[in-house]
């Protein structure tokens, strides 16, 4: 399913004529340029590879520069792929430009981003563990996780045990966000609700897979 690459600008709110307020995320979607068409005969699957933005050539390795020169497309800030079916792959070609007109008839979208990294966190912040007693004999164990296993049997800590560790900085998908407004002149799309990641982060926008209630 074809999508677009955008950049999260931040959040705001808009009011309807009836006075209803909606929190929305503003996403800037600049020109997406197709750099490669992947086919089953050569790559064992159908996909469209795109780039967006402009990047200086001295920031790239020679193989990366050669990839852009071969496609005849301006060097972008990254490469992203969208897997497609055999029938829809013929609608695209190398060098083609894509914009928000792709979503002109779409009501809901799925958005993929990278969540905010929080660094190393304890179990209270990371997994919402309950803290131990503030007093009543407790010393230096107010935010300790407690027991992490049993005895000689099984004699190990089970995989997946909720413990302290790195929080955030994961690929996160938010599904079924309503498209509130599309402005082709300013190259922005407003979607209802929050989107993962920092302002300025790259966002993948796709038509919603689960179109419940549409």
Swiss-Prot record:
- Per UniProt, what is one GO molecular function of this protein? structural constituent of ribosome
Matches recorded under Pfam families: Ribosomal_L3 (PF00297)
Region annotation Disordered: residue ranges? 134-153
Reply yes or no: does the keyword Ribosomal protein apply: yes
Which cellular components does GO assign to this protein? cytosolic large ribosomal subunit
Coiled-coil positions:
none
**Highest taxon of the source?**
Bacteria
Q: What are the entry keywords?
A: Methylation, Ribonucleoprotein, Ribosomal protein, RNA-binding, rRNA-binding
* Similarity field: Belongs to the universal ribosomal protein uL3 family.
Q: Which PANTHER family match?
A: 50S RIBOSOMAL PROTEIN L3, LARGE RIBOSOMAL SUBUNIT PROTEIN UL3C
Name of protein: Large ribosomal subunit protein uL3
């Amino acid at each position: 399913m074809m999508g677009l690459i955008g950049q999260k600008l931040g959040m705001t709110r808009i009011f309807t004529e009836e006075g209803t307020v909606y929190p929305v995320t503003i996403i800037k979607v600049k020109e997406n340029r197709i750099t490669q068409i992947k086919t089953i005969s050569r790559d064992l699957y159908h996909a469209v590879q795109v780039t967006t933005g402009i990047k200086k050539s001295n920031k790239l390795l020679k193989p990366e520069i050669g990839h852009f020169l071969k496609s005849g497309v301006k060097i972008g800030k990254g490469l992203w792929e969208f897997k497609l079916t055999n029938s829809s792959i013929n609608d695209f070609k190398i060098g083609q430009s894509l914009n928000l007109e792709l979503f002109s008839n779409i009501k809901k979208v799925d958005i993929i981003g990278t969540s905010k990294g929080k660094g190393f966190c304890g179990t209270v912040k990371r997994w919402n563990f309950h803290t131990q007693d503030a007093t009543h004999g407790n010393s230096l164990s107010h935010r300790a996780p407690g027991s992490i296993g049993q005895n000689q049997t099984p004699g190990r800590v089970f995989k997946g045990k909720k413990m302290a560790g790195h929080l955030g900085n994961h690929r996160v998908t938010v599904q079924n966000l309503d498209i509130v407004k599309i402005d082709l002149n300013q190259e922005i799309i407003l979607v209802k609700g929050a989107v993962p990641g920092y302002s300025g982060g790259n966002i993948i926008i796709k038509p919603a897979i689960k179109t419940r209630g549409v």
